[in-house]
Each structure stands twice: as C-alpha cells, then as structure tokens.
C-alpha cells in the first residue's frame, strides 16, 4: 500500500494551505507519516488518491452514522441543489429541521441554525452571558468546544493532539473569564462557584466527553452540574455537537435525561455538510436578535442544501440504525481488547455511548490528566499498522473512534485481520 499521490498532494497543499490541511489533526502530526488524501467514499469505504481502500472508523469525525453517500441523503442533496444553492432568505426546510431537533430533545424549545459547531458554542456562550448579565464561564480540562477564543483553554481534540495548553492570539482578558476545572470533579465545580459568587454565566460541558478520547460522565456528574448551576443562577450548556443524534435519537439527553438550559448540535444533524445549531429554553432563546438584544447572524445559516442533507440523515436514522451503531461499537471494542490482551499490552477500551476509544493504560480514564498519563507513545505504531492493512482510525490518541451503521461482516473481517498486527506493533513500540 503506497501513498505516492497523497504525498505529492500534501507537498502541493503545503505551498498554499498552512500545514497542508484545513484542520490540524488531518496532518498526521502526532502519528507521523503522510496524510491520506481521499478521492471518494461509499458505505464504510474510503478510497484515497492512490486507489487504496480503507474501512472508515472516523466517519468524518462523527457525521456519517449511515455511512458515506447514503442514497437518501444523496437524493435529498441533489433535489435541493437543483432548486438553488443559497437564497439568503428563510425556507421551509430550515423550519422542518428545527422542528425535528425540537421533537427529539425535550429541553430544546427553540433552535437557531448556524454553520459549524464552533459557531454554535460561541453563540451559546454569548447568549448565556447576555441572558444572565454575567461574564465568567466554567469549562472542563480536555473538553473541546470548537476554536472559540474563550473555550480554547486546556482543550482537548487538536490542542491535545499537539500538546498545546491554549492558543496564541487568545488574550489575557478572555482567558481570565474562563475558569477551567477537572472533568468529572463536582467538588472543583462547587469550589469555582464559591470563589466567584454571582459572576458565572454558565457551565459548558460535553454531555459525554469525546475529545480526550471517549470519557463518559461518572454517575451523578451531569446531574450534579444541573444542581449546582440552578443553585448559583448560572446556565448549563450541554455541548452535543459530537453526541447529538449519534449516541441515541435524542443524543446524550436520551441516555441520562439531564436537562440543560442550552444545547449545541452539529455533525450528525448536518448529514456531512456544514451545518450546526444551538437551542434551548424559549425564554433564553428569546434574547436572540431579532426578538432580543443578543446579536447572532450568518449569511449561509440554514443553507437549503445542508438543511436537506441533515434532515434526510436524521429521518433515515431509525431504531435499527441506532441498534446497529451499538453493536458495531461493541464489536470494534471487543476486537481491540482481544488483540491487545493477547499481546500483553496494558489497555483500557472505553465507550461514551457509541463513541469508542482505546487508552494504553490499565486504569479507567475519567479525566484529561488520566488520558494524558496513558502510554500515548504506543498509539502511532498501533495506528499505522491498522492503516497499512486497510483500516482508517483517527490519527490521534485523543480522539474518539466513530462507527457507522454501514459497517458489515466484510468490514469487521478486515478489522479483525488487521487488529492483531496493530497490537503487536503497539507492544513493540519504544518510549521516546
């Protein structure tokens, strides 16, 4: 399996695109080697520009729960595109998508469509500040909420991949208003409220963490956040960009029934096109322009083609799709466990709903510090052994693995053949 054409494209891209990619994790920076440039995809298969096929375990970082080029989604996009690509005016489709989201997540009474998860979290935090009249926010170490200045402090995802505590360009004033505490630590949250009486506008959390690897909230954690925010007059923002409509038809809310005040969504609700949303209680959402004083806008928000893709994806994701996602996540985790156990490699396979991760440690990982303490130096060898045998996992030890309902017996046969080689490579890896 060679990557000659990918290497040429990567070099060419580096002349005109910073780092040769448009999102840092795609550069293979933490695993080394040549990032694969993808030509096309169908079902569970990615095909790169060198003609190599891979079983996709990234799913475009979450959106593709049905697999790639699903007929219902492709037809919806084709039909919408024939009717026009963008109008800068309201459409029936955006109403239908908002209605679908509201119907699925009970605490969400109104929704505003945007273009990315970053826009959604940025807007939700601004709205929380505008609604409460407060400025400070609490976020959790290792939780990633997009590249919003105020939310980049000690974030997961790409920042974790590259070992960055924050980003240059984030001002001291912005950082001062962001209080970072340890995930799954209610005592730390309570202490932050006690130290900042009447100043905290919101707590923003991934409903289940997926950007330090898959780390589910400990029993009672989300419930505790709900209690503390109510006690202190702050809002609770549940970031479900990753978990929303993937871990269940109602997202993580469908698992623990803990009601946030505001929610952010993306990925699955986009059908693979640029679309996201934030929503919540009607009285809070009523503070948004044009009804209220908190400004938010977007030229392409509610784009008719993206809305059509998202609506088709949600409607095609029936009960059997969610059941299959669960089976596929478990099957993937079992294959990792069997292979790594056979090689005597310390590891822990973890799930956050149907998000999957492997940590090279014998301990359960419950927060970012524990994720970083794992033997992450084993991951590059593990990754490349899979990639060279036709399996495409996330190119970072700190990202969740995303299965799709398109994975079938043939796909799992390929994974099963590759996994023992990956386990051997992980076992043979040498700490730098």
Swiss-Prot record:
It catalyses: (S)-4-amino-5-oxopentanoate = 5-aminolevulinate. GO terms for cellular component: cytoplasm. Its cofactor is pyridoxal 5'-phosphate. It is an enzyme of class 5 (isomerase). Its EC number is 5.4.3.8. It is found in: Cytoplasm. Keywords: Cytoplasm, Isomerase, Porphyrin biosynthesis, Pyridoxal phosphate. The modification N6-(pyridoxal phosphate)lysine is found at residue 267. Pfam families: Aminotran_3. Pathway: Porphyrin-containing compound metabolism; protoporphyrin-IX biosynthesis; 5-aminolevulinate from L-glutamyl-tRNA(Glu): step 2/2. CDD domains: OAT_like (cd00610). InterPro entries: 4pyrrol_synth_GluAld_NH2Trfase, Aminotrans_3, Aminotrans_3_PPA_site, PyrdxlP-dep_Trfase, PyrdxlP-dep_Trfase_major, PyrdxlP-dep_Trfase_small. PROSITE patterns: AA_TRANSFER_CLASS_3 (PS00600). The keyword Cytoplasm applies. GO terms for molecular function: glutamate-1-semialdehyde 2,1-aminomutase activity; pyridoxal phosphate binding; transaminase activity. It comes from the Bacteria. One of its GO terms (biological process) is protoporphyrinogen IX biosynthetic process. Gene3D superfamilies: Aspartate Aminotransferase, domain 1, Type I PLP-dependent aspartate aminotransferase-like (Major domain). Homodimer. Belongs to the class-III pyridoxal-phosphate-dependent aminotransferase family. HemL subfamily. This is Glutamate-1-semialdehyde 2,1-aminomutase. It comes from Rhodococcus erythropolis (strain PR4 / NBRC 100887).
């Amino acid at each position: 399996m060679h990557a000659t054409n990918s290497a040429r494209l990567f070099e060419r891209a580096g002349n005109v695109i910073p780092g040769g990619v448009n999102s840092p994790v795609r550069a293979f920076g933490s695993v080394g080697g040549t990032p694969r440039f993808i030509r096309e995809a169908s079902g569970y298969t990615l095909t790169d520009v060198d003609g190599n096929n891979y079983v996709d375990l990234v799913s475009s970082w979450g959106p593709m729960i049905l697999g790639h080029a699903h007929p219902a989604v492709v037809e919806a996009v084709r039909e919408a595109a024939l009717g026009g690509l963008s109008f800068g005016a309201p459409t029936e489709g955006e109403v239908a998508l908002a209605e679908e989201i509201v119907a699925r997540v009970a605490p969400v009474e109104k929704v505003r469509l945007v273009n990315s998860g970053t826009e959604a979290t940025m807007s939700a935090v601004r709205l929380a500040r505008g609604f409460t009249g407060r400025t400070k926010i609490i976020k959790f170490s290792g939780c990633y909420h997009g590249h919003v200045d105020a939310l980049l402090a000690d974030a997961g995802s790409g920042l974790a991949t590259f070992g960055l505590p924050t980003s240059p360009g984030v001002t001291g004033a912005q950082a001062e208003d962001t209080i970072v505490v340890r995930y799954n630590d209610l005592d730390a949250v309570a202490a932050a409220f006690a130290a900042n009486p009447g100043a905290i506008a919101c707590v923003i959390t991934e409903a289940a963490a997926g950007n330090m690897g898959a780390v589910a909230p400990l029993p009672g954690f989300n419930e505790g956040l709900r209690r503390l925010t109510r006690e202190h007059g702050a809002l609770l923002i549940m970031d479900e960009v990753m978990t929303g409509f993937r871990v269940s038809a109602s997202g993580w809310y469908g698992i623990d029934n803990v009601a946030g005040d505001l929610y952010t969504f993306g990925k699955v609700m986009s059908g693979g096109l640029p679309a996201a949303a934030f929503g919540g209680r009607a009285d809070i959402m009523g503070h948004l322009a044009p009804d209220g004083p908190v400004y938010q806008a977007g030229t392409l928000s509610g784009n008719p083609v993206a809305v059509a893709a998202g609506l088709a994806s949600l409607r095609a994701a029936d009960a059997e799709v969610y059941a299959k996602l669960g089976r596929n996540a478990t099957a993937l985790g079992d294959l990792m466990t069997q292979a790594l156990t056979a090689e005597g490699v310390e590891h822990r396979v973890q799930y956050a709903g149907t998000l999957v991760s492997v940590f090279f440690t014998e301990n359960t990982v419950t927060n970012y510090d524990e994720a970083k303490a794992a033997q992450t130096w084993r991951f590059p060898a593990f990754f490349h052994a899979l990639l060279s045998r036709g399996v495409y996992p996330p190119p970072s030890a700190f990202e969740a693995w995303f299965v799709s309902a398109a994975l079938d017996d043939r796909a799992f046969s390929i994974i099963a053949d590759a996994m023992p080689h990956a386990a051997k490579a992980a076992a043979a890896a040498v700490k730098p």
